[in-house]
Amino acid sequence: IFYDAPSCRDNKQNQDEEGIDCGGTSCTYLCSVGVQKPSTRFVRPFAPAAGRTDVIAYIDNPNMNAAAKGGRFTIELYGTDGTVLARKQGTVDLPPASTVPVYVPNFVSGYIEVARAFVSYDEPTFKWFRYTDNRIVPTYNNDAEVTGTTAPRITASLTNPSAKALRDVLVIATVFDSAGNAIAATQTVAPTIPAQGTATVVFIWNEPFSTPPARVDVVPIIPLPSP
Protein backbone atom coordinates (compact mmCIF):
# COMPACT_ATOMS: atom_id res chain seq x y z
CA ILE A 1 0.00 0.00 0.00
CA PHE A 2 1.42 3.34 -1.02
CA TYR A 3 0.58 6.48 0.89
CA ASP A 4 0.95 9.93 -0.66
CA ALA A 5 1.21 12.57 2.02
CA PRO A 6 -1.10 15.56 1.47
CA SER A 7 0.61 18.53 -0.12
CA CYS A 8 -0.11 21.87 -1.76
CA ARG A 9 0.65 20.39 -5.18
CA ASP A 10 -1.55 17.29 -5.28
CA ASN A 11 -4.61 18.88 -6.97
CA LYS A 12 -6.74 18.00 -3.95
CA GLN A 13 -8.28 20.01 -1.15
CA ASN A 14 -6.79 18.51 2.00
CA GLN A 15 -4.80 19.49 5.07
CA ASP A 16 -6.35 22.78 6.22
CA GLU A 17 -6.60 24.17 2.69
CA GLU A 18 -9.45 26.54 1.90
CA GLY A 19 -9.49 25.40 -1.73
CA ILE A 20 -7.54 23.05 -3.97
CA ASP A 21 -3.86 23.60 -3.11
CA CYS A 22 -4.50 27.08 -1.71
CA GLY A 23 -5.24 28.88 1.54
CA GLY A 24 -4.97 27.70 5.11
CA THR A 25 -1.71 27.68 7.03
CA SER A 26 -0.08 24.96 4.93
CA CYS A 27 -0.01 26.47 1.44
CA THR A 28 2.00 29.36 0.11
CA TYR A 29 -0.62 30.45 -2.40
CA LEU A 30 -3.90 32.07 -1.42
CA CYS A 31 -7.28 31.14 -2.85
CA SER A 32 -8.62 33.60 -5.41
CA VAL A 33 -11.85 34.08 -3.48
CA GLY A 34 -9.85 35.57 -0.61
CA VAL A 35 -8.04 38.28 -2.57
CA GLN A 36 -9.00 41.31 -4.62
CA LYS A 37 -8.23 41.50 -8.33
CA PRO A 38 -5.65 43.89 -9.79
CA SER A 39 -7.05 47.07 -11.28
CA THR A 40 -5.91 49.80 -13.63
CA ARG A 41 -5.45 53.25 -12.15
CA PHE A 42 -4.91 54.65 -15.63
CA VAL A 43 -3.47 53.71 -19.00
CA ARG A 44 -2.39 56.35 -21.47
CA PRO A 45 -0.85 56.29 -24.95
CA PHE A 46 1.65 58.97 -26.01
CA ALA A 47 3.24 60.02 -29.28
CA PRO A 48 6.74 61.08 -28.12
CA ALA A 49 7.89 61.27 -31.73
CA ALA A 50 6.23 61.29 -35.13
CA GLY A 51 5.17 57.79 -36.13
CA ARG A 52 5.67 56.24 -32.69
CA THR A 53 3.28 55.48 -29.83
CA ASP A 54 4.37 54.60 -26.28
CA VAL A 55 2.09 53.50 -23.44
CA ILE A 56 2.23 53.99 -19.66
CA ALA A 57 -0.12 52.14 -17.31
CA TYR A 58 -0.40 52.22 -13.51
CA ILE A 59 -1.57 48.91 -12.04
CA ASP A 60 -2.95 48.73 -8.49
CA ASN A 61 -2.73 45.84 -6.04
CA PRO A 62 -5.35 46.56 -3.34
CA ASN A 63 -4.34 43.58 -1.20
CA MET A 64 -2.58 44.62 1.99
CA ASN A 65 -0.73 41.35 2.62
CA ALA A 66 -0.77 39.53 -0.71
CA ALA A 67 1.60 39.73 -3.67
CA ALA A 68 1.64 38.27 -7.17
CA LYS A 69 4.71 37.56 -9.30
CA GLY A 70 4.68 37.47 -13.09
CA GLY A 71 0.96 38.03 -13.61
CA ARG A 72 0.11 38.39 -17.28
CA PHE A 73 -1.75 41.35 -18.76
CA THR A 74 -2.73 42.58 -22.21
CA ILE A 75 -2.78 46.19 -23.41
CA GLU A 76 -4.89 47.07 -26.44
CA LEU A 77 -4.95 50.32 -28.40
CA TYR A 78 -8.15 51.35 -30.16
CA GLY A 79 -8.70 53.71 -33.07
CA THR A 80 -11.39 56.34 -33.38
CA ASP A 81 -13.69 53.83 -35.07
CA GLY A 82 -13.32 51.32 -32.21
CA THR A 83 -11.06 48.88 -34.03
CA VAL A 84 -8.06 47.35 -32.28
CA LEU A 85 -4.91 48.94 -33.69
CA ALA A 86 -2.36 47.00 -31.66
CA ARG A 87 -2.17 44.49 -28.85
CA LYS A 88 0.74 43.53 -26.61
CA GLN A 89 1.14 41.23 -23.63
CA GLY A 90 3.43 41.56 -20.64
CA THR A 91 4.00 40.46 -17.07
CA VAL A 92 4.09 42.40 -13.83
CA ASP A 93 5.09 41.85 -10.21
CA LEU A 94 2.65 43.34 -7.69
CA PRO A 95 3.93 43.85 -4.13
CA PRO A 96 1.28 44.22 -1.40
CA ALA A 97 -0.70 47.48 -1.37
CA SER A 98 1.21 48.87 -4.34
CA THR A 99 0.79 50.83 -7.54
CA VAL A 100 3.22 49.64 -10.20
CA PRO A 101 3.96 51.53 -13.43
CA VAL A 102 4.32 49.57 -16.66
CA TYR A 103 5.97 51.38 -19.55
CA VAL A 104 5.87 49.99 -23.09
CA PRO A 105 8.02 51.94 -25.57
CA ASN A 106 7.29 51.88 -29.29
CA PHE A 107 4.02 50.04 -28.72
CA VAL A 108 3.07 50.66 -32.33
CA SER A 109 4.76 52.39 -35.24
CA GLY A 110 3.11 54.44 -37.95
CA TYR A 111 1.06 57.58 -38.30
CA ILE A 112 -2.13 56.42 -36.62
CA GLU A 113 -4.60 58.14 -34.34
CA VAL A 114 -5.08 56.29 -31.06
CA ALA A 115 -8.37 57.06 -29.34
CA ARG A 116 -7.95 55.03 -26.16
CA ALA A 117 -6.12 52.18 -24.47
CA PHE A 118 -7.35 49.31 -22.31
CA VAL A 119 -5.67 46.85 -19.93
CA SER A 120 -7.04 43.36 -19.25
CA TYR A 121 -5.69 40.76 -16.85
CA ASP A 122 -5.18 37.01 -17.23
CA GLU A 123 -6.48 36.38 -13.73
CA PRO A 124 -5.41 32.70 -13.37
CA THR A 125 -1.77 33.81 -13.80
CA PHE A 126 -2.00 36.12 -10.79
CA LYS A 127 -1.09 33.54 -8.17
CA TRP A 128 -1.39 35.46 -4.92
CA PHE A 129 0.78 34.59 -1.94
CA ARG A 130 1.30 36.00 1.53
CA TYR A 131 4.24 38.35 1.50
CA THR A 132 5.86 40.80 3.89
CA ASP A 133 7.80 43.18 1.71
CA ASN A 134 11.43 43.03 2.82
CA ARG A 135 12.98 43.85 -0.53
CA ILE A 136 15.72 46.46 -0.65
CA VAL A 137 14.14 49.23 -2.71
CA PRO A 138 16.01 52.47 -3.42
CA THR A 139 14.28 55.66 -2.33
CA TYR A 140 13.43 58.41 -4.79
CA ASN A 141 14.51 61.67 -3.18
CA ASN A 142 11.66 63.70 -4.71
CA ASP A 143 14.18 65.98 -6.38
CA ALA A 144 13.36 65.67 -10.08
CA GLU A 145 14.65 68.63 -12.07
CA VAL A 146 13.23 69.37 -15.51
CA THR A 147 15.43 71.24 -17.96
CA GLY A 148 14.96 72.08 -21.61
CA THR A 149 11.76 72.53 -23.57
CA THR A 150 12.41 71.33 -27.12
CA ALA A 151 14.20 68.20 -25.84
CA PRO A 152 13.24 67.87 -22.17
CA ARG A 153 15.63 66.26 -19.73
CA ILE A 154 14.81 65.13 -16.18
CA THR A 155 17.47 64.48 -13.57
CA ALA A 156 16.66 62.79 -10.25
CA SER A 157 18.45 60.83 -7.54
CA LEU A 158 17.90 57.51 -5.79
CA THR A 159 19.28 56.49 -2.39
CA ASN A 160 20.19 52.92 -1.48
CA PRO A 161 19.44 52.32 2.23
CA SER A 162 21.23 48.97 2.40
CA ALA A 163 24.81 47.90 3.06
CA LYS A 164 24.96 46.21 -0.35
CA ALA A 165 25.20 47.88 -3.74
CA LEU A 166 22.23 47.59 -6.08
CA ARG A 167 22.90 46.94 -9.75
CA ASP A 168 20.98 47.31 -13.01
CA VAL A 169 17.89 48.85 -11.42
CA LEU A 170 15.08 49.63 -13.88
CA VAL A 171 13.61 53.09 -13.19
CA ILE A 172 10.42 54.47 -14.75
CA ALA A 173 9.60 58.19 -14.88
CA THR A 174 6.09 59.52 -15.53
CA VAL A 175 5.40 63.21 -16.10
CA PHE A 176 2.07 64.77 -15.11
CA ASP A 177 0.50 68.12 -15.91
CA SER A 178 -1.19 70.44 -13.41
CA ALA A 179 -4.49 68.57 -13.82
CA GLY A 180 -2.87 65.28 -12.81
CA ASN A 181 -2.88 63.79 -16.30
CA ALA A 182 0.12 61.77 -17.47
CA ILE A 183 1.70 63.55 -20.43
CA ALA A 184 4.95 61.61 -20.92
CA ALA A 185 6.89 58.61 -19.67
CA THR A 186 10.15 56.83 -20.25
CA GLN A 187 12.57 54.52 -18.48
CA THR A 188 16.26 54.06 -17.82
CA VAL A 189 18.56 51.71 -15.94
CA ALA A 190 20.71 52.74 -12.98
CA PRO A 191 23.88 50.63 -13.46
CA THR A 192 24.94 50.89 -9.81
CA ILE A 193 23.51 52.48 -6.67
CA PRO A 194 26.29 52.25 -4.07
CA ALA A 195 25.72 50.83 -0.60
CA GLN A 196 24.15 53.52 1.60
CA GLY A 197 24.81 55.92 -1.23
CA THR A 198 23.07 57.89 -3.96
CA ALA A 199 22.98 57.63 -7.73
CA THR A 200 21.70 60.06 -10.35
CA VAL A 201 19.30 58.93 -13.06
CA VAL A 202 18.58 60.87 -16.23
CA PHE A 203 15.53 60.67 -18.50
CA ILE A 204 15.57 62.22 -21.97
CA TRP A 205 12.89 63.00 -24.56
CA ASN A 206 13.52 64.16 -28.13
CA GLU A 207 10.27 66.12 -28.47
CA PRO A 208 8.60 68.80 -26.28
CA PHE A 209 5.97 67.83 -23.73
CA SER A 210 2.41 68.49 -24.89
CA THR A 211 1.69 70.66 -21.83
CA PRO A 212 3.91 72.12 -19.08
CA PRO A 213 5.05 69.49 -16.55
CA ALA A 214 3.87 69.92 -12.97
CA ARG A 215 4.94 66.68 -11.27
CA VAL A 216 7.25 63.75 -11.92
CA ASP A 217 6.94 60.21 -10.53
CA VAL A 218 10.21 58.31 -10.40
CA VAL A 219 9.73 54.63 -9.52
CA PRO A 220 12.50 52.02 -9.21
CA ILE A 221 11.34 48.52 -10.13
CA ILE A 222 12.68 45.72 -7.92
CA PRO A 223 11.42 42.22 -8.85
CA LEU A 224 9.64 40.12 -6.25
CA PRO A 225 11.34 36.94 -5.06
CA SER A 226 9.75 33.65 -5.99
CA PRO A 227 7.37 32.41 -3.28
Label each residue range with its predicted role.
Residues 93, 99-150, 184-187, 202-227:
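Terminal connector regions
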Residues 54-58, 72-74, 101-103, 118, ...:
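Beta-strand secondary-structure signal
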